[in-house]
Amino acid sequence: ASRVIGLVPTAEEEARLTASGLADAVVRADARDPVAVAAAIGEPVDVTVVCVDVPGCEHGAILATAPGGTVVFFSMATSFPAAALGAEGLAADVTMLIGNGYVPGHAETALDLVRTEPAVRALFTSRTGPDSAE
C-alpha cells in the first residue's frame, strides 16, 4: 500500500495508533456508521481490511473503498448477506474477499512481528501489559 489509514473508534485508540507510527494517517469514526466512515476517510481507498469485532461495519467499509477496489472482510462479525446486498444497494463496484484466518506459517509470522518490530510490540503491550509479548 502506498498509504495506510487506520480507522479507530476512540480518542485513546487514535493516540495509541498514532504514537505507534504504523499508519500514515489515523482517523476516528464509528465503523458502524457508513457516512461517518466515508467522511473520516475522505478520498476512497484501494484496499479496505475489516478486522473489527462488532457487527454492522460492512457498509462503511464498502463506502470507504474506491470503485474497482477490494474489501477484505477479516472479522467473524461480518454479515456476508449484508455486505453483498449493501454493495448492490450502494452501487459499489468493489471486490469482496473473505479472510479465512489461516495461512501456513501465519502464527510464526505474527509472533515474529511482535518480537522484532518495536512499534507492533509497543502497540500490543499497551493493550495487554508488558509481559504478554514474552
Predicted regions and their residues:
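Flexible, charged surface loops at secondary-structure boundaries
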Residues: 40-44, 63-66, 134
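Short, solvent-exposed polar/charged micro-motifs at secondary-structure junctions
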Residues: 36-37, 108-110, 133-134
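C-terminal capping/lid region of NAD(P)-dependent oxidoreductase domains
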Residues: 112-134
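Adenosine-nucleotide cofactor-binding segment
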Residues: 1-56
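A polyampholytic, Gly/Pro-enriched intrinsically disordered region
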Residues: 25-28, 95-96, 118-124
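Short leucine-rich amphipathic alpha-helices used at interfaces
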Residues: 40-41, 69-70, 120, 126
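Glycine-rich phosphate-binding loop and adjacent beta-alpha segment
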Residues: 52, 56-116
